[in-house]
Design a protein with these regions (language model features):
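Conserved, hydrophobic alpha-helical core segments of structured domains
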Residues: 1-99, 109
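Family-specific functional microsites
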Residues: 102
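Charged substrate- and nucleic-acid-binding regions of tRNA-handling and nucleotidyl-transfer enzymes
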Residues: 42-47, 105-176
Length: 176
């Protein structure tokens, strides 16, 4: 029922032709098509005269559409899942629907493997999100508080400290 999720399903691989390259031993690759595709959305929206309100949502899902399945190429760590949920925010459910719909192959064994991987990532998201409550996450410390606690003036260092706190939470080094 989400027309923009359906739109993303149609356009998420739009940059594959521009990024197609043959790598010896690997075959055809499309490295970076997700980032280039996200950057192409603004001009596509303008050419098609689409409303710009859903553009950030569409760009985000195009940019992130490979991330959930890429998690299973390594051990699915809590910090990787935290970063995914943090980056996707409220759109993580739509992102996972897109990933599930993108599992296509004529090879039944490959489809089974991808679905198993998808289920693993989905389960891990539920576990981590249940523990950490990351959706709509807000940093626990505001810039003004950092300035007051550290005796700093407004500036770059405040942002550096705020980002370091955010990274420590996402890595699980300090609790949320």
């Amino acid at each position: 029922d989400n027309v923009w999720l359906r739109f993303v399903a149609l356009v998420h691989d739009i940059a594959k032709p521009r990024t197609k390259a043959f790598k010896e031993g690997l075959g055809w690759t499309f490295h970076g098509h997700e980032e280039l595709g996200a950057r192409m959305m603004k001009s596509l929206f303008r050419r098609l005269r689409l409303p710009l309100d859903p553009l950030p949502y569409v760009e985000k899902l195009v940019r992130l559409h490979l991330r959930p399945m890429a998690l299973v190429n390594e051990i699915v760590t809590d910090s990787a899942v935290r970063r995914l949920v943090f980056d996707a925010g409220n759109d993580v459910d739509d992102l996972m629907k897109l990933c599930r719909a993108d599992i296509t192959s004529k090879n039944p064994g490959l489809v089974k493997k991808y679905i198993r991987n998808y289920d693993l990532v989905l389960q891990k998201i539920v576990e981590v999100e249940g523990r950490d409550r990351l959706r709509n996450w807000q940093p626990p410390v505001k810039g003004e508080e950092i300035m007051a606690i550290c005796g700093l003036q407004q500036g770059k260092m405040v942002g550096v400290l705020k980002k370091a706190i955010e990274e420590a939470i996402l890595d699980g080094r300090i609790p949320n």
